[in-house]
Amino acid sequence: MGGRTSPKVRVLLVDDLPDIRLVMRLLLEADGRVEVVGEAAEGSEGVRLAGELHPDAVVLDLRMPGMDGVSALPLIRDAAPGAVVVALSALPVGPMTDRAIDLGATYIRKPDLRRVVNLVGSLARSGPEPPKPKRPKRMGPAAA
């Protein structure tokens, strides 16, 4: 995973909501094997930090003002090619989440932050091979 120099999984948080970033930081760092190395409130800031910090994982909100997560995702992949990207959104599965998955992100619906912690924690256990992105099942009227 992108030449990890630290024994901890290095994570970049990109979400416009400060409370989500705070809770994610507290949950992730409580694991002891994860270090949040940066935070961004907007996609373009996340792209810049990904290039500077070279994180092992990026937790990326899909809906943000300015550059959204779907637009930022390929640029983050270019800036930090080895990083696993976990896309977060309160949106149900649909075109935006499908696009993120097609770009190689693992999608987790807010507020299931414990799944994010489990996924990022698994990187510390599994070493350089990131888990494969999973496409969630469509449910309800959106499935039509």
Residue ranges and their predicted role:
Residues 82-94:
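A short, hydrophobic beta-strand element within the central beta-sheet of small alpha/beta folds
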